[in-house]
Amino acid sequence: MSNKLAQLRKLTTVVADTGEIDAIKKYQPEDATTNPSLILKAAQIAEYAPLIDQAIAYAKTQSNDKAQQVQDTCDMLAVNIGKEILKTIPGRISTEVDARLSYDMERSVAKARQLVKMYNDAGISNDRILIKLASTWEGIRAAEILEKEGINCNLTLLFSFAQARACAEAGVFLISPFVGRIMDWYKAKEGRDFAASEDPGVLSVTKIYNYYKEHGYKTVVMGASFRNIGEILELAGCDRLTIAPSLLAELEAAEGELVAKLVDSKGSKARPAPMTHSEFLWEHNLDAMAVEKLAEGIRNFAVDQGKLEAMIAAKL
């Protein structure tokens, strides 16, 4: 019998949640995802120094203003890392829009277009890129605009069912519901551990997946933010799962039969009318965990973006 990672690949598209090329080469995922925290981590690896130098050189041709140079360097660095990753995978790279734009639809759209142009100028076509946006109302509306322009989006920091519904109704390409961070909140709140089958994050993704399939939504469900392989195994059969290298290693070492837990019902239930802005805000607000985790996630990504900018500024 093959290991559980090999079995999982037959049920689910496996994505690597890392910006580290060596890990991607080792596990050969279909796609890869990055975020500001992973870009910051990757930028501190010696082999990436030339990518930083090239990004700085590019930025200096774009502006004489140091603050603008920092912004342009960070954007080009994310694209440079994405380009390197794309050399080793057959599918798509997810590159994230600055988290500080999470509540600004117009600037999110502009930043997304800029990142895509950088990829396009390097010979990378749109069908190999996903633009990551936080699943705020503004982020979802930005994605709706971008999707109509042929720019596929990955809506991240998704914690509530309201966020999931709004994303499907906006026709976004893919969502990344966070499993582990949901579990973290309930573990802290209730002071107990959860069996994988009862894990609140697992239950959240299962509910979203089943709702999408029952109503015929095409939006891809990609579970993210895992704390252990138990959560991953309970979501076998999900459209995609983005997994950190350490957990990919555990899956590769695990033996035993793996069965699909999520199965596409291919339903055709009538869809409800799309949520209004006020309905979205109210439904999301009713989920205390989601309110806290969305805000925290945006803040934390913004902190790491700031650290990356400080690192770049010191090199200019």
Swiss-Prot record:
GO BP terms: carbohydrate metabolic process; pentose-phosphate shunt
One GO CC term on file: cytosol
Active site: 132
One Pfam family per UniProt: TAL_FSA
GO MF: transaldolase activity
Lipoprotein as UniProt keyword: no
EC number assigned by the record: 2.2.1.2
Keywords: Cytoplasm, Pentose shunt, Schiff base, Transferase
Family according to the record: Belongs to the transaldolase family. Type 1 subfamily.
Function text: Transaldolase is important for the balance of metabolites in the pentose-phosphate pathway.
HAMAP family, A to Z: Transaldolase_1
PANTHER family hit by this protein: TRANSALDOLASE
Identification of the protein by name: Transaldolase
